[in-house]
Amino acid sequence: MNPILKVNRVCKAYQQGNHRVEVLEHLSMSADAGEKIAILGPSGCGKSTLLSLLAGLDKPDVGTVEIDGQDLAKMSEDARTRTRSERLGIVFQQYHLMRNLTAIENVGLPLEILGKPDYADRARMALKAVGLSHRVAHFPSEMSGGECQRVAIARALVARPSVVLADEPSGNLDQKTGEEVMELLFSLCDEHNTTLILVTHNEELTKRCDRALILKNGALQKVKG
């Protein structure tokens, strides 16, 4: 079985003044359908850079990032946008909702981009799945941080993507709300056999993943699985 996500010898560097800083060096990894992988590492080690590459928001200097066998860097911008809407779900620490859109409009955006005529109905179902049927017409400013993160999870999963990329999704929430949000994310990924790539510092969440990898010196090292 071919991996759903494959990273092959990726390098990424940034210019800082007169210096070129290597962030990722010949990094490789893969993930199978339904697999949950925790990515660990200290602040500034390149975890966010890696997620940006996985999401097709940035391109590697060297190497390839493939989703369902397709190289993201070789796609047109329109094709990458469509891939992000259809095959990738993204949940950030900051939920990044459109403040001028209601919950149902935010959740329906990926489907609207894909031209799905039933996007409103599917967005409504996704909000029901995260326990927010009563918030469909509310704006982000009218909801709590935990509710907004639930909306972000609903948006990430509404198109039934192959992979969800999550960057410390409970990091800005209190412990109880964070635990509820993560339980929801794990449960929905299990239900739909969705691959989860989770950047986290939480040891308990790491234990729930099939594998744990630590990003060190620009490369990934296995610490579990």
Task: Set out the residue ranges of the language-model regions.
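ABC family nucleotide-binding domain
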Residues: I4-K216
